[in-house]
């Protein structure tokens, strides 16, 4: 953790280290290109967005909270911790992610394009876009709600689940879907 705090001090990032060792940063934190950063401390809270592209990070700490967006594109991340909280978008494109934790809630968009993800957890909540293009996804969970558009192009999905709700555009191009459920709700183009 001292290496992480040293980086914060060097970058003149206002932060608070609480008595329990947790670190609170109220603004955005960009660690872009910092290959020397290989881990983050447990119980880290970032009020703004967290940019980790080009770091040596391969896992995220327990109880990470990001008020803005979390950018992990192109990192060595292969899994996400339980209790991850992301208020904005979560960008996992180009990572080794193959699964998501149960009850994951993403306030903004969730970008999974080109990952090895093969299924989505129950109770997944996405406030913005959900991009599953070019993934190994073959089915969607029942009661999935996506606030923005849902991109399913070039997936193995052959049917849509009951009670699917999409606030924006539903992209079914190059899927095996041949019929739509009666209770499908799409706010934009289909």
Predicted regions and their residues:
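N-terminal capping/linker segments that flank leucine-rich repeat
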Residues: 1-35
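Thr-biased low-complexity repeat/linker tracts and other Thr-enriched repetitive architectures
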Residues: 38-190
């Amino acid at each position: 953790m001292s290496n992480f705090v040293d980086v914060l001090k060097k970058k003149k990032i206002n932060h608070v280290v609480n008595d329990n060792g947790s670190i609170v940063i109220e603004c955005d934190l960009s660690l872009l290109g910092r290959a020397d950063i290989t881990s983050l401390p447990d119980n880290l809270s970032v009020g703004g967005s967290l940019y980790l592209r080009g770091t040596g990070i391969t896992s995220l700490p327990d109880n990470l909270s990001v008020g803005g967006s979390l950018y992990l594109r192109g990192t060595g991340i292969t899994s996400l911790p339980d209790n991850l909280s992301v208020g904005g978008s979560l960008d996992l494109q180009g990572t080794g992610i193959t699964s998501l934790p149960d009850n994951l809630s993403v306030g903004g968009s969730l970008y999974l394009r080109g990952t090895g993800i093969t299924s989505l957890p129950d109770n997944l909540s996405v406030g913005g876009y959900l991009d599953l293009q070019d993934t190994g996804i073959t089915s969607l969970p029942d009661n999935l709600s996506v606030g923005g558009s849902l991109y399913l192009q070039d997936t193995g999905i052959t049917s849509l689940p009951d009670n699917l709700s999409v606030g924006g555009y539903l992209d079914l191009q190059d899927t095996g879907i041949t019929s739509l459920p009666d209770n499908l709700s799409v706010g934009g183009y289909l």
